[in-house]
Structures are given as C-alpha cells and as structure tokens.
Amino acid sequence: MAKTYNAGVKEYRETYWMPEYEPKDSDFLACFKVIPQDGVPREEIAAAVAAESSTGTWTTVWTDLLTDLDYYKGRAYKIEDVPGDDAAFYAFIAYPIDLFEEGSVVSVMTSLVGNVFGFKALRACRLEDIRFPLAYVMTCGGPPHGIQVERDKMDKYGRPMLGCTIKPKLGLSAKNYGRAVYECLRGGLDFTKDDENVTSQPFMRWRDRFLFCQDAIEKAQAETGERKGHYLNCTAGTPEEMYERAEFAKEIGTPIIMHDYLTGGFTANTGLANYCRKNGLLLHIHRAMHGVIDRNPHHGIHFRVLTKALRLSGGDHLHSGTVVGKLEGDREATLGWIDLMRDSFIPEDRSRGIMFDQDFGAMPGVMPVASGGIHVWHMPALVSIFGDDSVLQFGGGTLGHPWGNAAGAAANRVALEACVQARNEGKEVEKEGKEILTNAAKHSPELKIAMETWKEIKFEFDTVDKLDVKHK
C-alpha cells in the first residue's frame, strides 16, 4: 500500500519525542540545557530541538516520503530537571551516526548548534555535552602527535612543562620580541608563546618574528643543553596564508606552531593539524573567543564540548584555564575537561559535569595548558591540579620579575622542581606549598624575590558558570 501524505503542521512530539528509545552504541548523544518560552511543554520543546537539529522543519513536507525518517531523525529520549534551576531542564537527544560526515567536526557542530539555537520557542539553549561514538572518533585525525610523542620530541619527562606568553602582547619589534624569548628560555623555561592576537601586524611582520624567535631558541638550546620551543602563531586571514606560515616555520626548524582554533575555525584547524602530523610539527591551540560561547550558563556551548571537538579536530596543547588564576574556571568542571583532553575513556561523572561516557579509543591525548594570571605562589596548586602531563604557562608571572625575564623563568623553574620533588616524596603539595616554596627560596634568590613581589596578588572572584550540581 502506498504511503500517504498529510499536509499541514503537527506537533514535534508526535514524531521526535521517544521516551522508550534505547540509545545505540553508534548513536551521537547530546545533552541540551533548555529554557522554553512560557507555555511550551517540555516534551514539545525537547522534540523540537531534536527535529530542528536533524531532519525536521516547521511543516510536513512531501519529500519526507522519499526517505526513511524513522532511521534518520533525532530522538528526544529523556528529560531531567536541572539542580537548583526551576526554569531550565535537560533534554537528551540521540542522533544516528549517518547524519554526520566522517571526520568532520564542522558537520557535527553545524547540525547540533546550528539554526536550532535561534528557534523562537526557546528562550535559551546550551549544549552541555556530546557523546561521540567510538566508530565516529576513529574517522577523525585527532592530535597530530599527542603527549608521549611530544615528550620524546622535547626530551622532557617526569614533570609539567613550563611556558611563558611574551608581553606586551602587541607593540614590540621582532628583534625585541626575540630577545624576550631568549631571556625566558635561557632562564629555564621549556616554551615561550605568541599571544593569541599576535599574527602579522605593521610593528612586527610574521616572517621577521619567526626568524628572531628561532634564533632565540637555537641560542638558548646551545647554552642550556635543553630542547626549547616557541609557539609561532600561524593563524591568518586565509587558509593559504596560514599554510605559508606553517611551511616557513617548518623550514627554519621550529618544533611547534600555534593556531587560534575558534576564531580560525574547525576547517582550518583540522587542515593545520593534518599538516603538522605529516611534517613533524607540534600544534599548540589557543581558545580565544571561548568565553563568548561558553560562559553564559544558560546559552551557548559548554567548554567540555569545545574540548572534545578540539581533540577530534586536532591539537597537541589546549588552553584549559587555571582554577587559581585570573580567568573563569570551576575546579571540578576544569578537572572534568582535563580528563577529556588526556584520558582514553572518561566515564559519566555528574559531579564534574560529564553527562556521558566518552571513549576515545587509541586516539592520543591533548596536553592541557594552564595560563592566565598565575605566579610562583600558585605553583603548588597547579602541580596538584594538573599533574605532570601539562604545560604551566606564566606570562606576567615570568616577565614581571623585578630582575628581568631570565630571573622570572629561573624562579618558576626552581618552584616547579621543588613542588615536583615534594610530591614525589609523598608530601601534600597544596597544603604544604608555602613551606615547600620557602625552603626552595633559601637557595634561589630569584624565587625569593618572586615570592615577595606577588605575595599579595589574588584573583578571588566567584565563578559565573558553576556546575549545576553546586546550585543545590
């Protein structure tokens, strides 16, 4: 018997609300935090999100008969209350894997956070988490190299790596910029970094910066006997220009380059990650613009989703927040997305905001980068929070040392090694941090001065985007 077509508008929940559905291992699962307009039932708005982010539109169309909608449609299968928030609820939606292009984070994001976020029936909508099925994960390139390969390339083991963002971030000439890089690296840092908005400006063109920074790396390596690097920002206005900068960085022998993955876009990021994998370059990822997307607790995309998307798109480092510094970051939530960067399998853990199990299989991990308003007094907490597989990046906390960049770098290196040694001896580094640093400073005048300089500096502001479990 032929299918019949009934024109007109019908409620979304007639087709897309399926509370009896059992998600498959191959399904994408998404958790949206939703605030509907007044009078719109929860089931209807959950079904509307499922429809508008998959196969549905505002009216029935005859071409629905030309495909198997029951297979391809998104399914709203569960609704939950949000702790401490009577206005919002969680809508859980399952999507068949065939809705998304293989290996394309762009395809996934276009569907899940596309037009649906402008839907009039929604007052607010936030994508809290995605479960990427392992079958899909295996189609993505992931990090160009990963944590272990980076350690082997840089010949650094048993401790976090140390970095520094060169300041002032804008205005220096290429030669003065390179001098600042050299002083930091010879003082004891492993890496220095372009800030996110350092690209190719009239005061410092990219090619000049690359050359002076590479000279600084080679000179510092010769003096210290350690491998060094500087994150050369290849973010550009066009993909062609981005690849030209990456190619030049490879030619001069730099070990690591950088990309602003949100402003640059996932297409550019995945392409650059593929280039780095083929050409032996490490890739540092900055998250500039994330606060626009993830900070509002009711609308946007949670950073844990952006973290997963970056791991699939490709990057060896990713800025993760610090918990203790100047930037936004709830401790438990931060620990959750650090696990999502590094671990192979991350179980559901609502206490950290992780809504689904996530299996990355054999995909390499991403090194979290703690950066933003940190100094030597934060070192015990940073070592405790981030562990060894991380980069602790001090900008002003290096360059602001009264004795100069090299002294600031030396202070950070001494503080780091003292904390790592104390941890390895079984001490509770966070609780005993003051004593650990004070003892280390007896043998390091650079550390002593740094501790005196920043002893009163704190960033004690309440977190805006708290975990929902903390609102109870």
UniProtKB/Swiss-Prot annotation:
- What is this enzyme's EC? 4.1.1.39
In the UniProt record, what gene is named as encoding this protein?
Answer: cbbL1
NCBIfam families xref list: PRK04208.1
Give site residues, Transition state stabilizer.
K326
The name on file for this protein is: Ribulose bisphosphate carboxylase large chain 1
Catalysed reaction equations from the record: 2 (2R)-3-phosphoglycerate + 2 H(+) = D-ribulose 1,5-bisphosphate + CO2 + H2O; D-ribulose 1,5-bisphosphate + O2 = 2-phosphoglycolate + (2R)-3-phosphoglycerate + 2 H(+)
Q: Which cysteines are joined by disulfide bonds?
A: none
**Which keywords, in A-to-Z order, does the entry hold?**
Calvin cycle, Carbon dioxide fixation, Cytoplasm, Lyase, Magnesium, Metal-binding, Monooxygenase, Oxidoreductase
Q: Name one GO cellular component term.
A: cytoplasm
- Which taxonomic lineage does the organism of this UniProt entry have? Bacteria, Pseudomonadati, Pseudomonadota, Gammaproteobacteria, Thiotrichales
